[in-house]
């Protein structure tokens, strides 16, 4: 009939470690998604679309492009300081930011290059195991999540 119901609920406060785990989990949901410039869906996604959509799923808004995303957060110069969920930015020889990925572990990164993949990362950049070479030069690590 004519009954109405109201659900009253409070948002659960998620700790920072749980938020980092959420971001990694969301990013891995896109694993093997094909690369598509300008894409932001499981049918095709680009590097900055991946970071933007994953952070949005965790309740944090990021700008669309890597060159805009790099303006946010706190700088970290050393990979050893990085934590899961931090963003690593990569650039060309002119210094322009051309790529972004999500740090998973100190030596692993989730990013979209050909497809969403997990590669090794070190102080030089991303090492693609399939190609046996560096594909992206590391410029800066940014922490968007406040500890």
Which residues does each predicted region cover?
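Aromatic- and glycine-rich peptidoglycan recognition patches
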Residues: 3, 10-13, 40, 76, ...
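Short helix-to-loop capping/linker segments positioned immediately adjacent to catalytic or ligand/cofactor-binding
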Residues: 34-42
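C-terminal amphipathic alpha-helical segment
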Residues: 56-57, 81-84, 133, 143
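Sec/Tat-exported extracytoplasmic proteins
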Residues: 31-35, 58, 62
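...with weaker cross-activation on analogous glycine-rich loops/strands in unrelated enzymes
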Residues: 62-119, 124
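Boundary regions of SH3-family modules and the immediately adjacent low-complexity/disordered segments
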Residues: 1-33
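Active-site nucleophilic cysteine motif
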Residues: 27, 41-58
